[in-house]
Design a protein with these regions (language model features):
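Bacterial N-terminal signal peptides
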Residues: 9-19
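Beta-propeller-forming repeat regions
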Residues: 22-412
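N-terminal secretory signal peptides that target proteins for export/translocation
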Residues: 1-6
């Protein structure tokens, strides 16, 4: 369950039309909301219930429809030292706002904001004051949210989301008590506690997701090493059966970002779509065969010749599957996270921070390819990329927040 399907001066109203040389006639208009580093995650919702979608990143809400008005829902951070020292330094530091998700947590019909801080820190919900002025109440609802790509997904089938995180060396998710939604969520481990797992599943582990891999209607857990099958009864904590992948490369063992389960080639079986290394190269989909094994189909590698359109970029630290062109097939939206580890960290840290969508094209014979289309070359992704509707034309738009700023891309 994703709500996305909701310099010192801040610059408003800057627009740029970016033509996409695509097979599909898709173009985007770029609007720069801020050129400051405020966050690496963002989301959208109608926070003030005026009928227009708004954007949140960091401690700020930009109000639609033109996003020229902004308000702070919580005071600016005042961190004298550490990795999130303020003001946030894009060349050296990080933000307290790693990812953000909009959802009505307390059931009053007003969207609240869930913020994941740095990996291993607490997850907080900021409660919407129902349109009243002032800062929003802050509630810590989970104390140790590990992993670099936490999410918000319905894992138990009750129609309401859980925190898709792992914690203290165990994979799983955190279940919210909807009678007391702002209290501490209960962690539901699916792997055993062990010294080996403490090293394997730690605060900076990359690659995590959920999706129904075996067609039983229950979401399973995805990792770079394989998938964990949800049992029919999860009323009590239990170890979930593991099915090996792996979903990556031997020379890129770190893992990517958000992982997705989707029937890419239309054969009725769920496949896995993922980036390979959140701080390196690689994007691909892994076809599930009839016997449960997987065949890799690489979409993009480290060299232009690895991709039919000659596209190659590194640090794919956020990914979503969304139908971008209305053909009924889910496409990939991803890009480059700039300066993830500073100006000299990782590979090609100063290459253009690009933002792309990869169009899924099926051949009708069980095969499929993804065609690369550039959206922008001066933004990229953060640790999150959000796709939703910013206007009323019905076409999916894209928003990102990262060390370059905060940007909205309106599909034309």
């Amino acid at each position: 369950m994703r709500n996305s399907m909701s310099r010192l001066a801040v610059i408003f109203g800057m627009t740029l039309v970016v033509a996409v040389p695509a097979l599909a006639d898709v173009t985007f208009k770029k609007q720069t909301l801020s050129e400051r580093f405020v966050a690496e995650g963002c989301d959208l919702a109608d926070f003030d219930k005026d009928g227009h979608v708004d954007i949140t990143a960091g401690n700020t809400i930009w109000h639609g429809p033109d996003f020229s008005r902004r308000t702070e829902f919580t005071p600016p951070a005042d961190n004298p030292s550490g990795p999130t020292k303020t003001p946030y330094d894009p060349a050296k530091g990080y933000s307290d706002y790693f990812l953000a998700y909009a959802h009505d947590f307390n059931g009053d019909s007003w969207p609240d904001i869930l913020v994941y801080g740095l990996p291993g820190e607490a997850a907080h919900v900021f409660v919407n004051p129902q349109g009243k002025a002032g800062h929003w109440e802050k509630h810590a609802i989970f104390d140790v949210a590990d992993g670099e790509s936490p999410d918000l997904e319905d894992m138990n089938g009750d129609g309401r989301p859980e925190l898709l995180v792992h914690s203290r060396g165990q994979l799983g998710f955190a279940e919210i008590d909807w009678k007391e939604p702002l209290a501490q969520a209960r962690f539901r481990p699916v792997t055993p506690k062990s010294p080996e797992n403490d090293k394997k599943y730690f605060r900076y582990t990359h690659g995590y997701g959920a999706g129904d891999m075996n067609g039983d209607g229950r979401p399973d857990l995805l990792t770079k090493d394989g998938w964990f099958e949800q049992p029919a009864d999860i009323s009590k904590d239990t170890i979930w059966p593991f099915h090996p992948g792996p979903f990556g490369l031997a020379d890129a063992p770190r893992g990517g970002a958000h992982m997705e389960a989707y029937d890419v080639n239309g054969d009725g079986r769920a496949d896995v779509v993922t980036s390979y290394d959140g701080h390196g190269y690689g994007l691909g989909w892994f076809e599930q065969n009839a016997d449960g094994t997987f065949t890799e189909h690489r979409i993009m590698g480290s060299k232009p010749e690895d991709n039919p359109q000659g596209v190659a970029f590194s640090q794919l630290h956020a990914l979503r599957l969304v139908d971008m062109n209305g053909d009924g097939l889910a496409d990939i939206v991803t890009g480059k996270r700039r300066w993830a580890h500073g100006i000299n960290g990782d590979v090609e840290p100063n290459a253009p921070p690009v933002l792309y969508w990869f169009e899924l094209v099926r051949d009708g014979k069980g095969g499929a390819t993804f065609v690369a289309h550039q959206i922008d070359d001066d933004s990229g992704v953060g640790t999150q990329v959000t796709v939703g509707h910013l206007d009323t034309d019905g076409k999916p738009d894209v928003i990102v927040a990262n060390k370059r700023g905060v940007f909205a891309f309106f599909q034309q």
